UniProtKB/Swiss-Prot annotation:
GO terms for cellular component: proton-transporting ATP synthase complex; proton-transporting two-sector ATPase complex, catalytic domain. It comes from Thermoanaerobacter sp. (strain X514). Produces ATP from ADP in the presence of a proton gradient across the membrane. The V-type alpha chain is a catalytic subunit. GO terms for molecular function: ATP binding; ATP hydrolysis activity; proton-transporting ATP synthase activity, rotational mechanism; proton-transporting ATPase activity, rotational mechanism. InterPro entries: AAA+_ATPase, ATP-synt_VA_C, ATP-synth_a_Xtn, ATP_synth_asu-like_sf, ATP_synth_asu_arc, ATPase_a/bsu_AS, ATPase_F1/V1/A1_a/bsu_N, ATPase_F1/V1/A1_a/bsu_N_sf. Belongs to the ATPase alpha/beta chains family. This is V-type ATP synthase alpha chain. The gene is atpA. NCBIfam families: ATP_syn_A_arch, PRK04192.1. It holds the Pfam family ATP-synt_ab.
Length: 590
């Protein structure tokens, strides 16, 4: 370990000299308290260090010690149900040790060193293994089996492996490598956060990831291994959408990064997730969740690390063959941390003061998503889906972070303040949002849910777009100038908006809709549209169609429980019968 001295302190940036062996991104201990920092620039003898803790009290002449290792995370049993800060320090352990506030320079191991885990081998002595092979399992929580893998760079023959209870640092197996060296394998691996974990092959993202949110799954779907962003102004519901995705997305593991957002939002997650039951296993959602809390009152520099910490943990679970969803809330705060450090380094600023390399850093982050064939001889498949929230100041989508994000992500869920103020949630604007996965998902849904899924979706989108142009006419000259056909379009589009797209996150039934239920709900509205068109052609007055009691049943369909979807067949019959009754009644009057 080489030691240098501080020559300058500027907020979270510390400049030091006397570290000749220092390398980029090495972790250093700064000052007498041993604050954790990372080398982010080397110019001759001078190294610039980004410190992940409050730097008040540091001054020139204080010592700086380099560890010679990059910023790494500990990967092994004990991460699930955990809540960590941006550099993977467990907050519950810190709270027991020093109370409610994190003491500067506190050094606690990320994974519990005392707890013993029951290890069950999957290979035996004499077997040949290579990087990524699963050599055994640990039942980490009731619903997640933690698969212990050979580290990526190691291959050879298993010399010794035993079942039993071990801590994460005790050897569970010994492998004789091809060069004859004996390597001891523990349940814990260390991995540098800025380096993507390796895989065999990247696959196209073709399988949809149902989220239970109708506007997302039907109109703007995301796939397993896909990338999505949620930009929106303050108060438009970004965090609630992220929470909904974390709760109901069809992923086996969820990593939730609270990066620079309010502390009470992380508190909500901590209070809600243990109470909520996973629809597939009926166990608390917390049993499959890792939380990274790096709230707005924590040091700015640690926000940058938190995003990388989160995605490295997510990649590790992906390598086991799991489908992982990563929520980053919000990447704007991360970009602001980059801007602050760039300013302190006196770099040439780009647009709005952000560094010129902002787009590259964002692309590097989102490119770590994907559906892959993992390392290992069993060719297992894993997927990592990344959803990043963006908080543009004033909801201005032309600002650099949003624009750089849009260049790399494939799904854009644009949150609209007008919809939010009108209490339409989720406030995803159906006219400006898009998904580049919709064609792939359409093929999948046509095969697996119903052959007319694609037609229904296209028709719904057409009606919503037609409604937008008709509303302009209505605003200018009033609704009376519209033909009855146009008035029907407005009425059906309103039904799509209010009865289908609008969803109550806090209602026990409406909070989640399966793909089957979404299809049945949309089909009801479209059957009503087709039957109402026939009734209009037969001369039935529009007012009678508009006021018919069957409309109420369509509106209440969202509250039908998943176990009672046969109710939709009855409502379909009622709609056809009601419209037929209107036609026959009109014919009798004539």
């Amino acid at each position: 370990m080489s030691q240098g001295i501080i020559t300058k302190v500027s907020g979270p940036l510390v400049v030091a000299e006397g570290l000749p062996e220092a390398k980029m991104f090495d972790v250093v201990k700064v000052g007498n308290q041993g604050l954790i920092g990372e080398i982010i620039e080397i110019r001759g003898e001078r190294v610039s260090i980004q410190v992940y803790e409050e730097t008040s009290g540091l001054g020139p002449g204080d010592p700086v010690v380099s560890t010679g290792e990059p910023l790494s995370v500990e990967l092994g049993p004990g991460m699930l149900e955990g809540i960590f800060d941006g550099i993977q320090r467990p907050l519950d352990v810190i709270e027991k040790k020093v109370g409610s506030f994190i003491t500067r320079g506190i050094d606690v191991p990320s994974l519990n060193r005392e707890k013993k885990w029951k290890f069950t081998p999957k290979v035996k002595s004499g077997d040949k293994v290579s990087g990524g092979d699963i050599i055994g399992t640990v039942q980490e929580t009731v619903i997640v089996e933690h698969r212990i893998m050979v580290p990526p760079a190691i291959s050879g023959i298993v010399e010794d492996i035993r079942e039993g209870e071990y801590t994460v640092t005790e050897p569970i197996a010994r492998i004789k490598t091809d060069s004859g060296q004996i390597v001891e394998i523990t349940m814990m691996q260390k991995w540098p956060v800025r380096k993507a974990r390796p895989y065999k092959e990247k696959l196209p993202p073709e399988i949809p990831m149902p989220t239970g949110q109708r506007v997302i799954d039907t109109l703007f779907p995301v796939t397993k291994g896909g990338t999505a962003c949620i930009p929106g102004p303050f108060g438009s519901g970004k965090t609630v959408v992220q929470h909904q995705l974390a709760k109901w997305a069809d992923a086996e593991i969820v990593v939730y990064i609270g990066c620079g957002e309010r502390g009470n939002e992380m508190t909500d997650v901590l209070l809600e997730f243990p109470e909520l039951k996973d629809p597939k296993t009926e166990e608390p959602l917390m049993k499959r969740t890792v939380l990274i809390a790096n709230t707005s009152n924590m040091p700015v520099a640690a926000r940058e690390a938190s995003i990388y910490t989160g995605i490295t943990i997510a990649e590790y679970f992906r390598d086991m063959g799991y489908s992982v969803a990563l929520m980053a809330d919000s990447t704007s705060r991360w970009a602001e941390a980059l801007r602050e450090m760039s300013g302190r380094l006196e770099e040439m600023p780009g647009e709005e003061g952000y560094p010129a390399y902002l787009a590259r850093r964002l692309a590097e982050f989102y490119e770590r998503a994907g559906r892959v064939i993992c390392l290992g001889s069993d060719n297992r498949e894993g997927a990592l889906t990344v959803v990043g929230a963006v908080s543009p100041p004033g909801g201005d989508l032309s600002e650099p972070v949003t624009q750089a994000t849009l260049r790399v992500v494939k799904v854009f869920w644009a949150l609209d303040s007008e919809l939010a103020y009108a209490r339409h949630f989720p406030a995803i604007n159906w006219l400006t949002s898009y998904s580049l996965y919709s064609d792939v998902v359409e093929d999948y849904m046509n095969k697996n849910v119903s052959s007319d899924w694609g037609e229904l979706r296209s028709e719904a989108m057409r009606l919503l777009q037609e409604e937008a142009s008709l509303q302009e006419i209505v605003r200018l000259v009033g609704i009376d100038v519209l033909s009855t056909r146009d008035r029907l379009v407005l009425e059906v589009a309103r039904s799509i908006r209010e009865d289908f797209l609008h969803q109550n996150a806090f209602h026990e039934v409406d909070t989640y809709s399966s793909m089957e239920k979404q299809y049945r709900m949309l089909k009801l509205i479209m059957i009503f549209y087709q039957e109402a068109q026939k009734a209009l052609e037969k001369g039935v007055p529009f007012s009678e169609i508009e006021k018919h009691p069957v409309r109420e049943k369509i509106a209440r369909a969202k509250y039908v429980e998943e176990s009672k979807l046969t109710v939709f067949d009855e409502i379909e019959k009622e709609i056809k019968k009601a419209m037929q009754g209107l036609i026959e009644g009109g014919a009798a009057d004539a």
